[in-house]
Amino acid sequence: MQLAMIGLGRMGANMVRRLIKGGHACVVFDMSPKAVADLARDKAVGAASLVDLVRKLEKPRAVWLMVPAAAVDKTIADLVPHLESGDILIDGGNSYYVDDIRRAHELAPKAINYVDVGTSGGVWGLERGYCMMIGGPDAAVRHLDPIFKTLAPGAGNIPRTPGRERIGGTAELGYLHCGANGAGHFVKMVHNGIEYGIMAAYAEGMSILRHANVGEQQRAIDAETTPLRNPELYQYELNLRDIAEVWRRGSVIASWLLDLTATALTKDPALTNFAGRVSDSGEGRWTIKAAIDAAVPVPVLSTALYERFSSRGEATFGDKLLSAMRYDVGGHVEKTAG
């Protein structure tokens, strides 16, 4: 099957490579000519512009966008004048599901199909495959099934869920048509919110282990320092690298994210290459908003998001104000760091 890919970053480029390896024909475009040339060497057909890309596609055209969420509307606006009834636009990035609903409505008068795909797999997807959560009209999704099947990881060696043989479907192959437009990105949005929470749990747990030697450290004796009453209970010098590794082997918290944690700690146990400023790309915020609208309590996911804000210094003013209030209330002098 033929597919166009716009956006040849880490994920887009590797998705093209996986599709070519699976026997599909890919036409590619990116703002970087080098990115296009690199994939042309891997047997993709390069395009010099969006117009050139559309001209090289057979009808009905299938065009996959793998661009930042902020660039999707502009890219669609540039493409639409060159597309025709029956063509399919796929947004495989991390767009807000509300925008998917709007875009599908705007494209409907031109009979251009819009499909949203929440794509998980990151830089590992070339070899492992991509988990895909899909939203859009049934006919368009069915037409794209050969693409999804190639990109997906397949059943692999994951044991089948008991009773799954009676259900069937594509979910156990790693891709799922979740529902109408927006459903794919809605499910991916919550997936990423959960990811925030899991990552935060590992980070907090490892931080406790790292401070299990606090009893060996000298603590200031003053009104601003909480005394450690039983320092003899905190005398452990724990090897986080090895703990992460042993947890990978049969523990109930084993996961791919723990695998990556173990890899990071093996490369650099002190994590000296990281400052601890954790970004968020929007999905966590949207997840919390959906939870508020539906009156669903999500304390773990919301706390994980707020901690990302705090890591970037977003709480600095509030923390300063807390110190100011403590000083005015009781004359508490702020301690210096270190």
Feature map (PLM): residue ranges:
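Beta-loop-alpha module in the N-terminal Rossmann-like domain of NAD(P)-dependent dehydrogenases
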Residues: 51, 63-79, 96-99
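Short beta-strand and adjoining strand-loop segment in the mid-core
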Residues: 27, 128-152, 188-196
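Hydrophobic beta-strand scaffold residues
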Residues: 26, 46, 89, 113-115, ...
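NAD(P)-dependent Rossmann-like dehydrogenase/reductase catalytic/cofactor-binding core
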Residues: 2-8, 17, 149, 156-189, ...
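NAD(P)+-binding Rossmann beta1-loop-alpha1 motif at the extreme N-terminus of oxidoreductases
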Residues: 1-62, 86, 123-126, 327
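Rossmann-fold NAD(P)-binding glycine/threonine-rich loop
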Residues: 85-88, 92-141
